[in-house]
């Protein structure tokens, strides 16, 4: 999104506040409470409060302000960000061996996101609804049911899109951040001593005083930066400058004031640790605060759900996930999509997490939070510095210093969160592992299948020359053969000739290709090559944020002089029946998983929006 128009900059910045910062903006609901809840062996003590506040503030400065908003956000692919984009950029100028390692890192990072995203809506919404304990303690048994109701409504409206409701996100989140700042400032004025915690020496003192326990406590501190990946992933929607402007002018000051306000309250009233966020507010403001908190957490959850949809589409287009139905809910914004399968799988997972893992309180979810986030941070550091060295050609010693600085923060955070493994951290890690296995299985087995199908030695040019010299029976009209690779004879063409011994007067070999870019300009959309008097090759290129559409391809072909009409064209496609060959047991398991994924994948006619009555599928049996 361009920010050149200065008049639109405030609007874009406001929109960024509403979408990008929802997750990190709702962290004050639970972060300081989890830090000082007594689980690490110390209570609400002055040194502990100052130490945690200092750690939270400097973590926001170093990780968000410096690492992500100054360095990582520079690595964009035509303005787009995200862990898979970073993976793609990092592997452009490296050896095949290094590229394979970088791809694995990127896929692990993407898988971690899937694992962590199950926790985010649950902990955010529950933390907001838990304000009921302050307003009306007798309603605490309704926290879980109300959380499920709110999330059910949220997932149900996904199919309708969020274009209309989304217009309210920005003003609501701006109001939320102003409330954060106001509540915090009010408490700080009453106890300004808390501002001493801005001194990083309090963080150092915290480690020196509490030693090993302070290291483990980093697992709670990291809750303050959850959602940091959204700053990079949503870069394509808003641009770098509006995201930075929103952070430094609104989000960072508001978060800092609120955290320090909670700290000031705890120094004055240690018993407020049961819910320091809501106890910042005067009694008359509790119900309005509960309502705005619930709205803010719903918006944060919406941003996460949209992020899952976008990541899934990118993984599908890059060939790491099987094709699935993707519905565009807005004609104006390509990022407004809905994926039914992902939506309801995520919903089921979130409800299970709330009912089984939370045990009626969001604090139990905090124990499951952090491993995947910090793991992704480590991978982002490695991938982004690889881009700096290989793509930007920065000095290798300077890049090494940057990487060491990043890892000096990321690795302790990740290691500290490993302590959560048995108390809930296994959940996002397990979900992430499942997604990693699914993505690597689909990619590797798909490659094996295509290689097996293309093992025949027939030359496309030789076959076309032979058909032109000794043509089979020709019938009027146009036929299209979908070809996955250029210069390879489509299976459907061979089987049609073998069994039907007939061709149409005009034959088009169509290849739909995904380029390493989010978008492809219409000028470069279609390349047409006439291979013989009756054969044409058409290569249509799409970016990974675009959805291929054969009707659009035909329109472009018409502009280039190759007239095609959808309802007068026959599409021949091959349908592979797969048989597993002899393999070791572990590869056989992977093969069975691939067969399951392929059986449930979206069929090509639906994937490319081809009318079913124009499609002829020819079956073929392939051993893999």
UniProtKB/Swiss-Prot annotation:
Catalytic reactions of this protein: K(+)(in) + H(+)(in) = K(+)(out) + H(+)(out)
Topology versus the membrane: Multi-pass membrane protein
Keyword Transmembrane: yes
Molecular function (Gene Ontology), one example: symporter activity
UniProt xrefs under NCBIfam families: kup, PRK10745.1
Family listed: Belongs to the HAK/KUP transporter (TC 2.A.72) family.
Role: Responsible for the low-affinity transport of potassium into the cell. Likely operates as a K(+):H(+) symporter.
Annotated protein name in UniProt: Low affinity potassium transport system protein Kup
Organism listed in the record: Shigella dysenteriae serotype 1 (strain Sd197)
Gene of this entry: kup
